Curated annotation (Swiss-Prot):
InterPro entries: Ribosomal_uS2 (IPR001865), Ribosomal_uS2_bac/mit/plastid (IPR005706), Ribosomal_uS2_CS (IPR018130), Ribosomal_uS2_flav_dom_sf (IPR023591). One of its GO terms (biological process) is translation. This is Small ribosomal subunit protein uS2. SUPFAM superfamilies: Ribosomal protein S2. The lineage of its organism: Bacteria, Bacillati, Bacillota, Bacilli, Lactobacillales. Belongs to the universal ribosomal protein uS2 family.
Length: 255
């Protein structure tokens, strides 16, 4: 049983890697073929590894793990925020601030400041302050919310980190590894998989692909927390959705 079907992966464009000249040779074992200068990801491996990632995240959530979703590129920002929120977890979907994990104490101080400004407004303090000061406070709050709003209520450093595009989020991955935090990631053909604990070979540049994978991991968290199966499983049908079909789809899309 698979949590994501081959058909779903194909329809979302998960199989499209980067141009061959931009590849990382360490991803060779996850590449099925090359067509028209584009690497094609081996979706049979993606199906299997997505199952493993689902189980890993589900089991972590069942043990009350704090899970941080990270994806700051525009293709990932919305899905990361929406799915982390749906799963009752935390996210960073704008620029990663250096030291977010390794200098957590300083980040907590900034979060405290954000909460303080919000409390001032709720208690009516803004009404008695000069307009210029209120404008400055609003500007400060907006900036803090942009970068820290998704982790405002995160109780501690995360137990697991899920990353969309570890090539872009190298600083985040390095901080997690330094602290021994396992990293689950969508890894495209241009990335280095060595620092990733749970790899999902996938196109991390297509909005639909990011949404598909990210939503399944959110399902895993919900299942782990509630003890219910939040995801629809699919029988692996290698005849109907064989890896050879990927080549046909790629050739069709590239013609």
């Amino acid at each position: 049983m698979a949590v994501i079907s081959m058909k779903q992966l194909l329809e979302a464009g998960v199989h499209f890697g980067h141009q061959t000249r931009r590849w990382n040779p360490k991803m060779a074992k996850y590449i099925f073929t090359e067509r028209n200068g584009i690497h094609v990801i081996d979706l049979q491996q993606t199906v299997k590894l997505a199952d493993q990632a689902y189980e890993f995240v589900r089991d972590a959530a069942a043990n009350d793990a704090v899970i941080l979703f990270v994806g700051t590129k525009k293709q990932a920002a919305e899905a990361v925020a929406d799915e982390a929120t749906r799963a009752g977890q935390y996210f960073i979907n704008h620029r990663w601030l250096g030291g977010t994990l390794t200098n957590w104490g300083t980040i907590q101080k900034r979060i405290t400041r954000l909460k303080e400004i919000k409390r001032m407004e709720e208690e009516g303090t803004f009404e008695v302050l000069p307009k210029k000061e209120v404008a400055l406070l609003n500007k400060q709050r907006a900036r803090l919310e942009k970068f820290l709003g998704g982790i405002e209520d995160m109780p501690r450093i995360p137990d697991v980190m899920y990353v969309v595009d570890p090539h872009k989020e190298q600083i985040a991955v390095k901080e997690a590894k330094k602290l021994g935090i396992p990293v689950v990631a969508m890894v495209d053909t241009n990335a280095d998989p060595d620092d990733i604990d749970v790899i999902i070979p996938a196109n991390d540049d297509a909005i639909r692909a990011v949404k598909l994978i990210t939503s399944k991991l959110a399902d895993a968290i919900i299942e782990g927390r509630q003890g219910e199966d939040a995801s629809v499983e699919f029988e692996a049908d290698t005849k109907a959705d064989s890896i050879e079909e990927i080549v046909e789809v790629v050739e069709g899309d590239n013609n």
